[in-house]
A protein has these predicted regions:
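Charged/polar, solvent-exposed surface patches and flexible loops
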Residues: 10-11, 30-33, 49, 53, ...
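Long, low-complexity, charge-rich intrinsically disordered regions
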Residues: 74-195
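Helix-turn-helix/homeodomain-like alpha-helical modules used for DNA recognition
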Residues: 17-103
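Short acidic, gly/pro-rich beta-turn/loop elements at beta-sheet edges
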Residues: 14, 41, 123
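Short helix-start
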Residues: 1-17
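Helix N-cap and loop-to-helix transition residues
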Residues: 5, 22-25, 44, 59, ...
Length: 195
């Protein structure tokens, strides 16, 4: 089935498609981890070198566009009493909980985070998530690949999620932080040509 909603049309219109082929989830996460100063041990040395070289030429808009296929977004409704269960099962991202302060956003009870495709059905059933209720208070980024780790996603991933948001404040906060992270990464790697 294919569902076309106002939100999906606005989201598609929001995407900038100008700059080349999109990254695979593995490379998209690596790029967002790399600009966050995190380890990307799932890449080979040559892949790291090529990615570093590519990241030194990108701006925030290009990076968001290239990383757009890292996960698909599922917006769902959940009872307030079950939100904690969802929070424990995913890697939090965007402006969820205490992450909101990092972006000067107001903290809400909404939950946003990442999980593997193989875990989606289990979490939907356990937390009794509903896609047919509004407003959605759970946004799940479902991916075929998520780097190993626990806790919140790195700040680069959170920034990209916010930059993809249809909310103007969230989008602006995400792009501002991505611009800062990229600028720092590019100045730290300027002129370096080592593997």
């Amino acid at each position: 089935r294919l569902y076309i909603t106002n939100e999906s049309v606005r989201r598609l219109n929001h995407v900038d498609r100008k700059r080349g082929r999109t990254f695979s989830p593995r490379i998209a996460f690596a790029s967002l981890y790399m600009i966050s100063g995190e380890s990307v041990n799932w890449l080979s040395a040559s892949e790291k070198y090529q990615l570093k070289k590519r990241l030194t030429t990108l701006n925030a808009t290009d990076l968001v566009s290239l990383c757009r296929n890292r996960a698909r977004l599922c917006s769902m409704w959940c009872r307030e009493s079950r939100l904690e269960k969802v929070t424990q099962e995913i890697r939090l991202s965007a402006g969820t909980g205490e992450l909101a302060a990092e972006f000067n956003l107001t903290e809400t009870s909404d939950v946003e985070g990442y999980l593997l495709e193989s875990d989606l059905q289990r979490i939907v059933e356990q937390a009794k998530l509903r896609s047919d209720f509004q407003p959605a208070n759970v946004r799940l980024h479902v991916s075929s690949y998520i780097p190993n780790g626990s806790g919140n996603m790195p700040i680069g991933v959170c920034s990209a999620d916010l930059a993809d948001s249809l909310d103007v404040r969230e989008c602006g906060a995400g792009f501002d932080k991505l611009t800062q992270l990229l600028s720092r990464f590019q100045s730290d790697n300027k002129g370096k040509d080592s593997r």
